[in-house]
Amino acid sequence: MSPDPHRVPPRLPVPPERLVGRVLRIPPDRCRYRDRTLLLRVTRVRIVISQWYGGDWVWLDGDEIDLHGVALATVSELVHVSACAPRPPASP
């Protein structure tokens, strides 16, 4: 049986396990179905259900947090893989 050409794992810039526990600042153009920036503390990367987006999008579960780190809601979000890249450290 040949692999399904429509199933492509997400092309994440880091291994999925390195995303768990991280806080991502996701701009609205990198998160489907959102119209404002999302602060997300990642609890799970859903590789299996993310294979239908050409490798460009991934489903992330996590806690939406405010600027103080307080959890507002538990969410599942479809995020562009570019939003999962490590951010460079802030310069002093």
Q: Model-found features: residue ranges?
A:
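Short, intrinsically disordered, low-complexity terminal/loop segments
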Residues: M1-D4, A90-P92
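Short coil-to-beta transition motif at edge beta-strands of beta-rich domains
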Residues: P15-T43
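Intrinsically disordered, low-complexity, charged/polar segments
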Residues: D61-P92
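Short edge beta-strand segments in beta-sheet-rich domains
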Residues: T37, W57, T74-S76
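Short, conserved beta-turn/loop elements at beta-strand boundaries and strand-helix junctions
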Residues: R46-Y53, L67-G69
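Beta-strand elements of modular eukaryotic interaction domains
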Residues: V14-P15, S50
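Short aromatic-glycine-enriched beta-strand elements
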Residues: G54-D61
